[in-house]
């Protein structure tokens, strides 16, 4: 059975794994999921990620990060969904928690944070909010 929203599935797997304090979470891999994991690692929300191939299927393993026994990611919310895409121009890019959080945006230059998109002067599809 095909999945209608693999990005929402990825975010839900991360939320569920952190709720039970797992050290890592494994999911099917795709280029977009790897790009999201790279942004999360660059921003310090996850420890590490790795793509492994087994039996012709690629898997993405994400190492979760905790601080003082609590998950580093407090909020992980999907914004643009398959049924309702959310696009923002370069002057409309949202701030998450007044700049404390990050919005991950898909732009013509690739996936990037809201701060980088504002600095570059590009808009795009708002994938998710992370705080």
Curated annotation (Swiss-Prot):
Subunit (UniProt): Part of the 30S ribosomal subunit. Contacts proteins S5 and S12.
Taxon lineage: Bacteria, Pseudomonadati, Pseudomonadota, Betaproteobacteria, Burkholderiales
Similarity comment: family membership: Belongs to the universal ribosomal protein uS8 family.
Protein name: Small ribosomal subunit protein uS8
Biological processes per GO annotation: translation
Role of this protein: One of the primary rRNA binding proteins, it binds directly to 16S rRNA central domain where it helps coordinate assembly of the platform of the 30S subunit.
Pfam families the record matches: Ribosomal_S8 (PF00410)
Coiled coil start-end: none
Cellular component aspect of the GO annotation: ribonucleoprotein complex; ribosome
Source organism of the structure: Ralstonia nicotianae (strain ATCC BAA-1114 / GMI1000)
Encoding gene per record: rpsH
Keywords carried by this UniProt record: Ribonucleoprotein, Ribosomal protein, RNA-binding, rRNA-binding
One function term, GO molecular function aspect: structural constituent of ribosome
Domain of life according to the entry: Bacteria
